[in-house]
Swiss-Prot record:
It is found in: Cytoplasm, Cytosol. GO terms for cellular component: cytosol. Substrate binds at residues 84, 204-206, 535, 540, 697, 777-778. Catalyzes the isomerization of citrate to isocitrate via cis-aconitate. Has probably no RNA-binding activity. Its cofactor is [4Fe-4S] cluster. This is Cytoplasmic aconitate hydratase. It comes from the Eukaryota. Transmembrane segments: none annotated. NCBIfam families: aconitase_1 (TIGR01341), PRK09277.1 (NF006757), PRK12881.1 (NF009520). One of its GO terms (molecular function) is metal ion binding. Belongs to the aconitase/IPM isomerase family. The gene is aco-1. The keyword rRNA processing does not apply.
Length: 887
């Protein structure tokens, strides 16, 4: 290696380790770098082999102050990869299919194998089918196995067939919380005892949660993650780093959720897509690691690549609290201090060089929620009722629903669970304590328990139409809620544990009670969900719930009792059985109350007990049987696991490159089209093309499961692409998964229209607005359009991960020039488009688009690096990896 001269010994306790001493570069620029850039530099120095990583890459990172302005390209080799099952199943399917392709090309299929640690946590499969009783957990877990046995069998095969692949069984918790509490190393002990910082990329956009503990991590597309597993560095543009200074302390009634919603809005307003955000300032010292992890978790919602908190003394305290031993914590602290990556936030003079900075006084943060349709639309809690009421009749937008004024006061009497109640606009029909964003944070979980305790003591109850659920991100939460005596109070008002997984946060909210569903449908009610999740895009949480508010766990409990978001939070919230009027101060715990419970009941032994046997899984998991073979025995009759067609007919030669000629527009879309719109994860509509496919193979609607669970079958996923019932397509006469097949003038299901174009040999393109592909890091949001025949997307801007996924599938991302979009260019989507793709294409090149109406405009080709161009010329990143590995 080029920098072996920097290797030094480091004695820690009874052990002597090695490490790359970056101070040995004797370069003053090193000390000025943000800590996150130091992590990139250390990885480049350690991996510098003059092949994957060059000396000039090291210089580019060292010269970050200048190179950040020049779109300079660098490689990065993370220490490990993390997956969840919705993205993990298709990743393992791809790896299995790649083994077949390599064998068919006459090479050793064992070449397809992860070269770095890969952890896959099964957390996306469990749904809230049962709730509000003590049997809910066991019943939901039983149904999860019944629905997903074939998927789980496949994953268990993968853990045996591939080296370096750890499967964490279902029922263990949520991937990012398990990563934070157990999987993360903080500092790795590598080959020959070399120490280096932990870093990770994951196939879930909220991988960034780990940044809160000083581990550098972010989400990538599943396709890119597979390349990393096989030894390929990530190619990235060296990022700008926004320094976010925090000062002061949070006030007594404010939660970490309120803080993260404030930060999310501030950073989204600033515009940080493709940038690193690094937190500093004396205020950081007052935040627990759980608070920091909550802020880092919602990094995708504010659009940055990472939201990073360097390691400090509170990180060491957290590692101790979560059961890591003294050798571990000493190794972390002494190594990071040796390389200048350990921070003292109480030192006001600590101010690295940043691209730009912004500042927040924690004392200015007020109780907040975000919604009703986007996570960065923060609303002060005091204004929620007014904001919702106004949005009912305002023109349809991200904040409004477009009801007629005469329909805004509708109400209907329903009977549910033997109780009668009025259901109106704003009625809270889902109240969920869910998501790693908040269930990883003891302060807000204990606060939720304290609200429940006070409610029970006051004789209050949840409204009969509210579906309540508690889905902790790990078993540790259950331990401290039990130890504190708060769990029985949560159970008393219906917040029984429904499962250990993502559940409501990702749309696995399960069905509403029938009387509630009937009332909503018959009266076109705009009902609400209040959840402690991180996303609330249209159609994500539940197809019948149009207004969804992200809130802290105690607010989820409180609104289940109030029953409506259209209620003044500063007024009377409820009335006790003896007639006492209850206001917020009567039921809301102070930060001091919460801190006392946390100090007493969150213990290291709970973490050690929970994680001691986490890899064993349940009896059902242990009894799963799978073949111990290197090549997967595909079952043609399976509707869950199918060999993908991406490598069919592949040879060692590069495919020929062709222009896009006379393409039709499959969809003409607006702004903020999410990966949920493109490739939904939730339930499969009984009238959809995917449902027709399943029914044709003898699957009953009861067993359709979800699109997320079906991601191992490309036939279903191609049919589920753009199947979101809230999709707004300017080529269609109504909202939903339909489009205009331009040649015939017919409105068809999007999949059916795409098939017509494919059968006729006509390429398809997509027109879109700003932030195309925002949301989850869903590789099927690129794979699906590829299978539908989409050759290019022309958008005003792309979310980072989705742009990478498109390139990984050989779809070209084109970007309108500044100030232009489909409307300004007079495009309706009914035209045909021809786009020449030159053989000597360069990153960021301007390309002519010829329109059938005679006009010509130029777009920016959003291949940002030469490596991305190489992937495209190979037909995709996985095809590139196969050719590289068999050489």
């Amino acid at each position: 290696m080029a920098f072996n001269n920097l290797i030094r010994n480091l004695a820690i306790g009874d052990n002597v380790y090695k490490y790359f001493d970056l101070n040995g570069l004797n370069d003053a620029r090193y000390n000025e770098l943000p800590i996150s850039i130091k992590y990139l530099l250390e990885a480049a120095v350690r991996h510098c082999d003059e092949f994957h990583v060059l000396k000039k890459d090291v210089e580019t990172i060292l010269d970050w102050k200048n190179s950040q302005r020049n779109q300079a390209e660098i490689p990065f080799k993370p220490a490990r990869v993390i997956l969840q099952d919705f993205t993990g199943v298709p990743a393992v399917v791809d790896l299995a299919a790649m083994r077949d392709a390599v064998q068919n090309m006459g090479a050793d299929p064992a070449k397809i194998n992860p070269v770095c640690p890969v952890d896959l946590v099964i957390d996306h499969s469990v749904q809230v089918d049962h709730y509000g009783n003590l049997e809910a957990l066991a019943k939901n877990q039983s149904i999860e196995f019944e629905r997903n046995r074939e998927r789980f069998n496949f994953l268990k095969w993968g853990s045996k067939a591939f080296d370096n692949l750890l499967i964490v069984p279902p029922g263990s918790g949520i991937v990012h919380q398990v990563n934070l509490e157990y999987l993360a190393r903080t500092v790795f002990v590598g080959k020959d005892g070399v120490l280096y910082p932990d870093s990770v990329v994951g196939t879930d956009s909220h991988t960034t949660m780990i940044d809160g503990s000083g581990v550098l991590g972010w989400g990538v597309g599943g396709i890119e993650a597979e390349a990393v597993m096989l030894g390929q560095p990530i190619s990235m543009v060296i990022p700008e780093v926004i320094g976010y200074e925090l000062v002061g302390t949070l006030s007594d009634t404010v939660t970490s959720t309120d803080l993260v919603l404030t930060i999310t809005k501030n950073l989204r307003d600033l515009g940080v897509v493709g940038k690193f955000v690094e937190f500093f300032g004396t205020g950081v010292a007052s935040l627990s690691i759980a608070d920091r992890a909550t802020i880092a978790n919602m990094c995708p919602e504010y659009g940055a690549t990472i939201g990073f908190f360097p390691v400090d003394s509170r990180t060491i305290d957290y590692l101790t609290q979560t059961g890591r031993d003294t050798d571990y914590t000493q190794r972390v602290e002494q190594y990071l201090k040796s390389v200048g990556m350990f921070v003292n936030f109480t030192d006001d003079s600590y101010r690295p060089t940043y691209t730009t900075t912004l500042k927040l006084d924690l004392g200015s943060v007020v109780p907040s929620v975000s919604g009703p349709k986007r996570p960065h639309d923060r609303v002060e809690l005091a204004s929620l009722a007014q904001d919702f009421s106004k949005g009912l009749t305002d023109k349809i937008s991200f904040k409004a629903f477009g009801l007629k004024p005469e329909d805004a006061t509708k109400s209907v009497t329903i009977t549910n669970h033997g109780r009668t109640a009025e259901l109106t606009h704003g009625s809270v029909v889902i109240a969920a304590i869910t998501s790693c964003t908040n269930t990883s944070n003891p302060s807000v979980m204990l606060a939720a328990g304290l609200v429940a305790k006070k409610a029970v003591e006051l004789g209050l109850n949840v409204q009969p139409y509210v579906k309540t659920s508690l889905s902790p991100g790990s078993g540790v939460v259950t331990k401290y809620l039990e130890a504190s005596g708060l769990l029985p109070y949560l159970e008393k008002i219906g917040f029984n544990i429904a499962g250990y997984g993502c559940m409501t946060c990702i749309g696995n909210s399960g069905p509403l009670d029938e009387p509630v569903t009937k009332a909503i449908e018959e009266n076109n009610l705009v009902v609400a969900g209040v959840l402690s999740g991180n996303r609330n895009f249209e159609g994500r949480i539940h197809p019948h719930v149009r207004a969804n508010y992200l809130a802290s766990p105690p607010l989820a409990v409180l609104y289940s009792i109030i029953g409506n978001v259209n209620v003044d939070i500063n007024g009377v919230l409820a009335v006790t059985p003896d007639g006492k009027e209850i206001r917020l101060a009567d039921i809301w715990p102070t930060r001091k109350e919460v801190a006392k419970f946390e100090e007493e009941f969150v213990k290291p032994q709970f973490f050690r007990e929970v994680y001691a046997n986490i890899e064993l899984g349940s009896t059902e998991w242990q009894q799963l049987e799978c073949p111990a073979v290197k090549l997967y025995p595909w079952d043609d009759a399976s509707t869950y696991i199918k060999k993908v067609p991406f490598f069919d007919g592949m040879t060692s030669e590069l495919p020929s490159q062709s222009d896009i000629v006379n393409a039709h527009v499959l969809l003409n879309l607006g702004d903020s089209v999410t990966t949920d719109h493109i490739s939904p994860a939730g339930s499969i509509s009984k009238t959809s093309p995917a449902a027709r496919f399943l029914a044709g193979r003898g699957v009953t609607p009861r067993d359709f499961n979800t699109y997320g669970a079906r991601r191992g079958n490309d036939e279903i996923m191609a049919r589920g692409t753009f199947a979101n019932i809230r999709l707004v397509n300017k080529l269609a006469s109504k909202v939903g998964p339909i489009t205009l097949h331009v040649p015939s003038g017919e409105e068809l299901d999007i999949f059916d229209a795409a098939q017509k174009y494919k059968d006729a040999g006509i390429p398809a393109i997509i027109l879109a607005g700003k932030e195309y592909g925002c949301g989850s890091s869903r590789d099927w949001a690129a794979k699906g359009p590829f299978l539908q025949g989409v050759k290019a997307v022309i958008a005003e801007s792309f979310e980072r991960i989705h742009r990478s996924n498109l390139i990984g599938m050989g779809i070209i991302p084109f970007q309108y020039q500044a100030g232009q979009n489909a409307d300004s260019l007079g495009l309706t989507g009914k035209e045909q488009f021809s786009i020449g793709v030159p053989d000597d294409l360069k990153p960021g090149q301007l390309i002519d688009v010829n329109v059938s109406n005679g006009s010509v405009f130029q777009v920016i080709c959003r291949f940002d690096t030469e490596v991305e161009l190489t992937y495209y010329r190979n037909g995709g990143i996985l095809q590139y990896m196969i050719r590289k590995l068999i050489q």
